[in-house]
A protein has these predicted regions:
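Vicinal oxygen chelate
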Residues: 2-11, 46-50, 68-177, ...
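Core segments of cupin and vicinal oxygen chelate
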Residues: 9-60
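Short, flexible, glycine-rich and Lys/Arg-enriched loop motifs at helix boundaries
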Residues: 37-41, 72-73, 144-147
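Histidine- and/or cysteine-centered catalytic micro-motif in compact active-site loops
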Residues: 60-62, 92
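Short, surface-exposed beta-strand-loop junctions and turns on beta-sheet-rich folds
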Residues: 63-64, 138
């Protein structure tokens, strides 16, 4: 079973739209606006991420059950580090991952990159403070991986990996010479 869509909420629909269309390269494919059960109304925007899956964004208006300044970052709202709750999108191969990293930098973002040994990931935050990852699997999982994963899942004190230090790729200058 795959994902149909994952939904997030925004307080800045224009910045969010620019981010997911220009930076991420997704296409806005559907918008629904409807009254909310508690009052007010909401707009639900669907961005095609590829393979028939979507990222949905809620834009909430005049809802008495929703505070004016609500926290859009799930992690920050729970008092957790930003990397805990995040969106991870798949790159087909390392060339696509590199092209995505270069596009993010050209859009003015510093990009973190980590080689996890079985995948390589790049990271940035969206305008809502949600961590966004693009990940390329570099090694297939085998039966030994599943067995080791189950053992580590059950371990009271699993062995820890060495700290992963990301490579930082700074944003490219947006100023023209």
């Amino acid at each position: 079973m795959g994902f149909h869509h994952v939904a997030i909420t925004t307080r800045d629909p224009e910045a969010t739209h620019r981010f997911y269309t220009e930076v991420m390269g997704f296409e806005l494919v559907r918008v629904e606006a409807a009254p909310a059960a508690e009052g007010g109304w909401a707009r639900h925007l669907f961005y095609d991420t590829g393979n028939g899956e979507c990222l949905a964004v809620w834009d909430i208006h005049d809802n008495p059950a929703v505070p004016d300044r609500f926290e859009t970052s799930i992690s920050r709202g729970l008092g957790l580090p930003s990397w805990t709750n995040h969106l991870a999108f798949a790159a087909r191969d390392l060339e696509e991952l590199t092209a995505t990293r270069d596009r993010w930098r050209a859009c003015g973002f510093d990009v973190l990159q980590i080689d996890h040994g079985w995948c390589t990931s790049i990271y940035l935050d969206d305008p809502n403070g949600i961590a966004v990852e693009c990940c390329c699997t570099t090694r297939a999982f085998g039966p030994e991986d599943a067995a080791a994963a189950e053992e580590l899942r059950r371990a009271a004190a699993p062995p820890l990996l060495d700290a992963m230090v990301p490579e930082v790729y700074p944003a490219l200058s947006l100023a023209s010479s």
